[in-house]
Structures are given as C-alpha cells and as structure tokens.
Amino acid sequence: MSQIRAIVGTQWGDEGKGKIVDFLAKEADVVVRAQGGSNAGHTVEAFGKIFKLHLIPSGILYKDKINIIGNGVVIDPESLIEEIESLQKEGISTENLRISDRAHLVMPYHKILDEEQEKQRGEESLGTTKRGIGPAYTDKTERTNLRVCDMLDEDEFVHKLRIVYERKNRILTEVYHKTPMKFGELLEQFMKYGEILRPYITDTIKLLNDAIKEGKKILLEGAQATMLDLDYGTYPYVTSSHPTVGGFCIGAGIAPKHIQEVIGVVKSYTTRVGKGPFPTELLDRVGDSIRERGKEYGTTTGRPRRCGWLDLVVVRYAVLINGIDKIALTKLDTLSNLPKVKVCVGYRHAGKILDLFPASLKVAMECEPIYEEFDGWSEEEIKKAKEYDQLPKNAKKYIEFIEKETGAKVFLIGTGASREDIIIKEN
C-alpha cells in the first residue's frame, strides 16, 4: 500500500517546511509540489551549502527521488530554468524532475500587471511578491491562460496567445502607460523555454497515480501556509492558491482518500510578510531580536518578516482545517536565551474569548492576545541536545503545552539550521 504524507504550513508561511520536507524525503520515493509559484521560497541547508528553492521540490537534493511540479503550480519558465541551472552548477542533478503538462504559465505581462496593480492600490496594497502569481491565477480562472503543454506546440501557442495578446497590450498601454509587448518576441521566448524544459514535461497525474498503485512513498510539499489560503486565510492578505491539504489534492491530481498522514509545520514563534492582521506581533526589542536570531528575511523578496509570539489560536485553526495528525516544530533554538517566552492561547474581543481565528479582518485587527508565560532556556542546552530527553526542562514544558493545546503530537523538533539539527520525539 502506498504511503502519502502531506506537509502543510500552519501559520503565514516561512515555518521551515523546506527543511522538514528535506528530512522526510529520505524515506520517500516521490516529492510533489502542488500549488503556488515562484512567490514561495524554501531554504534548505545541505552539503555545507544553502539552497534556496522557489519552484522545485526540496527532494531534488536527493539523487534517487522523483520530484514533481504539479498541475496546480503556476510556472514562470524563466525562473524555473534559472533554478535548474543554479542547482546543476552546484552539482545537483535535475534529471529526476518532472513538470506537469497541465500546469499554467506565468507570462511576462502577468509580472508587469502584478507590480502596477500593487502601485495602484496605494495604501491598500496587499504586499505581493510582484512575481505575477495573482494575475496568472486570475487568467487561469477566466480560462484565458496558457499552459505548459502549449509551449510544446507552436501552432497551439500562437492560437492561444493571439486571443489574449491585444487585450493585454491595451491594458498595459492605456491603463498603465507601459511599453506594448511584441508578439514575435513573446513567441520566440516561450518556444525556447519549451525546448529547454521539454525533457522534464510529462503527464504527472498518470505518473503520480501509477506510483500510488505501485505502493510508492509520496510526500506532498506545501508552499505558503494555511493563513495565506484564499478561502481560509486573512483575506484579502492571502495568496491566490490553496496551501491547505484540499488544495494539494487538486494541485497534484490525487484523490483525498490516498492521504494517510498530515504533518503540520509550526514555527516556535510566528512571522508574516506584508500586510494583514497579526495579533501576537512584537514591535519591540524582543521582536527585533527574534528577527535577527532567526534570520527572518524573505527567501524570495529579502523583506524583513514581522515577528511575534507563537499563536496557538492560529495553529489550532490550521489543525482543524487540515486534519493535522502530527506537528513538526521548527526553530526552537531561535527562542533561546530569552528570560520569558509567551504563547497566545486565545483572543479577547468585545468582552468575548475567541479560541479560533475570526473571519472578519476588522475583528482580527482588534483582537487582544491572551498569553501563557514560560521560563526560557539557554542556547547551549538546546545545541547539546540530540534526543528529546536531553532538551532543557523548560523547552519540554513549552513543547508539551503546544501538544495539549492543539491536540496534535509533536514528533520532530528543529534545533538549528542544518538538516542534521532535528530531534525525533517518540510518542
């Protein structure tokens, strides 16, 4: 019987999913990325180097794993080719990479529109990465976008590009006063991309479902996180896809019944990039200290991340939506050397106590966090620990409190940046 595990972010992204996928990929045969685009960033430290992946699954760092970019991903071919070449320069083989022929493309006009729309929003800007992801998903929904398979058939690409070309140029020139695109240049560019990527492009739905029939071990790698989900996140400060388990099934092309285990990745504190509610945000020296110690700067944009205490209202919500079975807790070392560590267990709003995240953005902005406080631990104690029993007493209290409040057992604990800095907690 095939074993399928889904790895989902429980907060606003940047939880350290890449490291957890890299660790668990040792046991997998196939690693799948199912949604998002080059707006996501996974950082993995391996072989004494730091790898920053945006589109390619983290399993690519293992020679014997099939790595799939699924149909739910929107692909910027230029960015993907750069990523492939960057890995190859570091001696990492990409021959086991597979790209869905059904995946949608991020076109050059999507990136221009993304940037111009953000400017137009002014103070109401969403804080997008300006990588064209939102406009690409918009065209997908409008049924006017081009797909990966179209790059392999020039006649089909010409036909589909002609349908949208004039309209996109009118928007660029008349609304945003930008230089019009040239049809011939776009065609030549994407035919070239198609030839470079042709060896990787295949029907990944068949490939994945054949792997399930053969009893292969499969890892579904989420990008972004639950609180950025288009339906469940802090709308409109969300992404344009569904980084929840339901979205993985759609974006990979597998039936929900095949998923046996859902692993939620929880950072030991909370961060988010861009605008939107953040009840436990720290706008003081503690927040600055966490940012610097945790190197909390965006993999994709380099923007400093907003930092705050761990919010179990958010994690509880993610456990509920995704049916999370186990938790991988990351970056415990970052909280070292603080005299006190706080955890949010509920929100106070208009005389009521909320234990799940509210739908209303206004309510979320007005919520006052209710904290439990813990004594801190030293970095030296964390770094020395190789097994759970060797962790400092106060850190174990922190971990066991998370388990009690969320109803999900912690089974992995990240204690440093390297792929070796992980403690397995036997339950």
From Swiss-Prot:
Active site (UniProt): 14, 42
Gene Ontology cellular component list: cytoplasm
Keyword Membrane part of the UniProt annotation: no
Keyword set, alphabetical order: Cytoplasm, GTP-binding, Ligase, Magnesium, Metal-binding, Nucleotide-binding, Purine biosynthesis
Origin: domain of life: Bacteria
Name listed for the protein in its UniProt record: Adenylosuccinate synthetase
Organism: Caldicellulosiruptor saccharolyticus (strain ATCC 43494 / DSM 8903 / Tp8T 6331)
Pfam hit, one: Adenylsucc_synt
GO MF term list: adenylosuccinate synthase activity; GTP binding; magnesium ion binding
InterPro entries: Adenylosuccin_syn_GTP-bd, Adenylosuccin_syn_Lys_AS, Adenylosuccinate_synth_dom1, Adenylosuccinate_synth_dom2, Adenylosuccinate_synth_dom3, Adenylosuccinate_synthetase, P-loop_NTPase
Classification via Gene3D superfamilies: Adenylosuccinate Synthetase, subunit A, domain 1, Adenylosuccinate Synthetase, subunit A, domain 2, Adenylosuccinate Synthetase, subunit A, domain 3
Binding site residues for GTP: 13-19, 41-43, 305, 331-333, 414-416
Quaternary structure note: Homodimer.
One BP annotation, GO: 'de novo' AMP biosynthetic process
Catalysed reactions listed for this entry: IMP + L-aspartate + GTP = N(6)-(1,2-dicarboxyethyl)-AMP + GDP + phosphate + 2 H(+)
Family note: Belongs to the adenylosuccinate synthetase family.
Function: Plays an important role in the de novo pathway of purine nucleotide biosynthesis. Catalyzes the first committed step in the biosynthesis of AMP from IMP.
Binding sites annotated in the UniProt record for substrate: 299-305
Pathway: Purine metabolism; AMP biosynthesis via de novo pathway; AMP from IMP: step 1/2
Subcellular location: Cytoplasm
Binding site for Mg(2+): 14, 41
Essential cofactor(s): Mg(2+)
